[in-house]
A protein has these predicted regions:
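Conserved small/polar residues in nucleotide/adenosyl-binding loops
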Residues: 1-5
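Aromatic- and histidine-enriched alpha-helix N-cap/loop-to-helix transition segments
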Residues: 6-7, 94
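Short secondary-structure boundary micro-motifs
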Residues: 7-8, 57-59, 65-69, 75-77
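N-terminal glutamine amidotransferase
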Residues: 9-13
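Mid-to-C-terminal catalytic subdomains of enzymes
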Residues: 21-26, 30-45, 69-138
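A mobile, often basic/glycine-rich helix-loop segment
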Residues: 34-66
Length: 138
C-alpha cells in the first residue's frame, strides 16, 4: 500500500467526515474500462494490457489483468480500509457490472474515437470544466 496515496485519501475522508458526508464515490475502474492506460494502441503505462485500442472482438482481450486482477483488489482494499476508518462508505460506480457492460457494448469506433471519449463527450455536452488529456490523481 502506498503511504502517499493512503495519506491523501485519509485527508479527503477526514474533511468529508467533518462536513458530515457518509459516502465516498470512488473513481476506481474508470481508467481500466475507458482506456486501459493507453490510446490508439500506445501504452501510457507499463501495466496497460492493450494500449487502449479496443478490438472488434472483445474475447481477444478478456479478462484483462488491470481490471480483473490484483490492481483493483489492491485499490479497493486501500479505499475500504481508509474510508472505513473515518466511518465513510465507499461506492464504486465504474466497477458496476451494468456500467462496464454498457461501455463495452459500444462500437470499437466510438470507444477508440478519442482518449476516454465517453467521459470527454459527457463533460463537453454538460459544459463541465476539465483539463483535456491531463490525468490528475493521487
Amino acid at each position: 500500500m502506498c503511504i502517499r496515496d493512503s495519506g491523501s485519501l485519509a485527508y479527503i475522508c477526514d474533511l468529508a467526515k467533518q462536513d458530515g458526508n457518509k459516502v465516498y464515490i470512488s473513481g476506481s475502474g474508470a481508467d481500466e474500462i475507458f482506456s486501459d492506460y493507453g490510446f490508439g494502441g500506445v501504452k501510457k503505462y507499463q501495466h496497460s494490457n492493450f494500449g487502449g485500442l479496443f478490438p472488434d472482438d472483445l474475447t481477444t482481450i478478456f479478462p484483462w489483468a488491470s481490471f480483473y486482477g490484483s490492481s483493483q483488489e489492491t485499490y479497493i482494499a486501500k479505499e475500504e480500509h481508509v474510508a472505513g476508518s473515518f466511518g465513510i462508505e465507499t461506492r464504486y460506480p465504474y466497477l458496476d457490472k451494468y456500467v462496464v457492460q454498457e461501455f463495452l457494448s459500444l462500437t470499437p469506433e466510438l470507444k477508440n474515437a478519442k482518449y476516454k471519449s465517453v467521459l470527454f463527450n459527457y463533460l463537453t455536452e454538460n459544459n463541465y470544466p476539465f483539463c483535456e488529456n491531463e490525468k490528475i490523481g493521487f
